[in-house]
Swiss-Prot record:
PROSITE patterns: RFX_DBD. The keyword Chaperone does not apply. Disulfide bonds: none annotated. It comes from Saccharomyces cerevisiae (strain ATCC 204508 / S288c) (Baker's yeast). Belongs to the RSC9 family. This is Chromatin structure-remodeling complex subunit RSC9.
Length: 581
């Protein structure tokens, strides 16, 4: 009481004591004033865009804010993203694990090489801690819907981890690591077995309807993983569990994506099979073969057709021993006979011969081109012959060499005089002789051509007068003096022409253009696979079912060869094997 009274005034407010000195370091964050700031998304990303961006200030940092100038300088950079993600998985904190799996999922989709299982060997064991517990959860999917939040979180994290592995399995390095892991392969077979229970109606385990969504997603990821590893566990022996389970699912499912994935897996499981060894394909029954062959009827689905042909190719490949087994089914034989020739031209634009059948061929009329607007040029020899003549013989000879008498034709007087004057005016004056005057030259036209006359034509609309020479027009080619004098005496109509045999004076005979028939230059993927499969069938023995089949469809194949030239090379083996049948 005494101590309290001595330190407390009458108003009850304690008296502040002097701060005691301490050797402990002062925390700078305790004295820092909290100032609210606004940070845009571009600033937080470290890039400045828009009008403020320039060559000197491309990168933008949060350190530009004044509030960050007071931060301690003695700081160290944190761990990189991949280490941070791995530490989050190991933390055991649900929020951290979910964040980490989400980040890994993004990497597996956009940059799988960054988290390759070969370069980061610790990742697969971490993912397995979320995937393997799914077996226990799947065992309970036959009872009731998952209501427990903890179980739901485990299921979602397991599905995310499985999806990450599914994405990484598309990389060659990563899938080679997965194949070596027995637990992963055992998990894949476990999920496939559960789906087989659903397919076969096994009473021991049937999926509860409310859990179908989760199980369907799980099955899709598992089938993708199976497709990725199937090439590495081939060839499948006769009683291979993977092969048998996949066949059971194939006969049950109607899911297109699953069917294609299963067919690819089955094809890869048969790779490297040997004729002298028992194979998983020996267990296939006619029902399954007929189902796979029936997929060839779906002309709108190229992926499914290719997957089916790939499987059939691998099925009969080892020594071509199973060709007879394939054609034992009449249904398979009929479908193959109906579809294979058509698949050779799948998605290929074949020539349209109907255009030629409908097109009427017409010859274009041979018409004389319109008369030239200027007199023809004179050869040097003809010019010298005319130049030596005196007037009016020179003008008369020039008119007959360069013009022809045409009854309905006309040529302006001024153009006629200028053409003559431009040819001979200067050379004649330089020789000391005189050119025939223009008036006399126009009068002389009647002497050169009996039916030609200088007339004046008045336009009835405008009243303008045109001074023309009626009855002549320029020739296409100048004649010699003797030929010109002879031809000038016989006038012709405007519909006829002199020297019709001269190809330069008339248009050559030609027909109207016909539609162009275009032949394809490339084969489609389906066509290539069909060619490969057909060539394999043709390798059967002469009395085998495959050879008989190839012989039956040969006329149809020849028709395709005529329409699609690239098929000639692709089917060269088939044509060689069937030539002597």
């Amino acid at each position: 009481m005494n101590s309290l009274a001595s330190n407390t005034p009458l108003n009850g407010t304690p008296v502040s004591e002097a701060p005691a000195t301490s050797s402990e370091p002062v925390n700078m964050f305790e004295t820092m004033v909290a100032n609210p700031i606004k940070v845009s998304r571009l600033q937080s990303n470290g890039v400045l865009t828009g009008p403020a961006a320039n060559t000197k200030s491309i990168h933008y940092s949060l350190a530009n804010f004044n509030v960050f100038q007071s931060l301690p300088k003695e700081t160290a950079r944190g761990v990189d993203d991949l280490t941070r993600m791995e530490m989050a998985l190991l933390s055991g904190i649900p929020e951290e694990i979910k964040w980490s799996l989400k980040k890994y999922l993004t990497y597996s989709n956009k940059a799988p090489y960054m988290i390759s299982l070969r370069t980061l060997p610790d990742l697969l064991p971490l993912f397995k801690t979320f995937i393997l517990p799914l077996e226990r959860i799947v065992e309970g999917l036959n009872k009731s819907s998952i209501c427990d939040s903890k179980a739901m979180d485990s299921l979602q994290m397991g599905l995310n981890a499985l999806l990450i592995l599914r994405n990484l399995a598309q990389d060659t390095d990563s899938v080679q690591i997965l194949v070596k892991d027995r637990e992963i392969k055992s998990f894949i077979l476990f999920i496939l077995k559960k789906f087989q229970c659903v397919a076969t109606g096994d009473n021991k385990w049937q999926l509860y309807e409310g859990n179908a969504t989760f199980f369907n997603e799980l099955t899709h990821y598992t089938l993708d993983l199976m497709e990725a590893i199937s090439s590495y566990i081939a060839p499948a022996m006769k009683d291979d569990h993977y092969f048998q389970t996949l066949v059971s699912i194939l006969n049950y499912t109607k899911d297109r994506y699953m069917v294609i994935s299963i067919l690819r897996s089955l094809s890869r499981l048969l790779v490297r099979s040997k004729a002298n060894e028992e194979s998983a394909a020996d267990n296939l029954d006619h029902k399954t073969l007929s189902l796979i062959v029936s997929f060839l009827l779906l002309e709108c689905d190229s992926e499914l057709i290719i997957a089916s042909l790939d499987f059939l190719y691998q099925y009969i490949l080892p020594g071509s021993q199973r060709i007879t087994e394939l054609f034992k089914s009449k249904e398979c034989s009929l479908i193959l006979e109906a579809t294979l020739p058509n698949l050779l031209s799948y998605n290929i634009a074949t020539p349209d011969y109907h255009l030629l059948q409908k097109h009427k061929i017409r010859l274009i009329k041979r018409l004389k081109p319109p008369a030239p607007k200027e007199p023809p040029n004179l050869s040097e020899d003809l010019f010298q012959q005319l130049f030596k003549l005196n007037e009016p013989l020179r003008s008369t000879a020039w008119l007959r060499c360069c013009f022809e008498p045409v009854q309905e034709a006309e040529f302006t007087q001024i153009s006629l005089w200028r053409s003559y004057e431009s040819k001979f005016g200067q050379p004649v004056r330089e020789s000391g002789r005189k050119l025939l005057p223009a008036v006399e030259f126009i009068k002389n036209v009647s002497n050169a051509f009996n039916n030609a006359a200088a007339i004046v034509i008045t336009d009835p609309v405008t009243g303008k007068k045109r001074f023309v020479i009626k009855g002549i027009q320029p020739r296409f080619k100048a004649l010699g003096i003797a030929d010109g004098e002879r031809e000038s005496q016989v006038p012709i109509s405007a519909l006829k022409s002199k020297f019709l045999n001269d190809s330069k004076e008339i248009t050559p005979a030609r027909q109207n253009s016909i539609p162009e028939v275009k032949f394809p230059q490339e084969l489609s993927d389906v066509s290539k696979v069909a060619c490969t499969f057909l060539c394999l069938l043709s390798n059967d023995t002469d009395d085998g079912a495959g050879s008989a089949f190839c012989q039956r469809i040969r006329p149809l194949v020849l028709h395709k060869l005529a329409d699609i030239p690239p098929l000639t090379l692709a089917l060269s083996e088939y044509m060689e094997n069937t030539s002597g049948l």
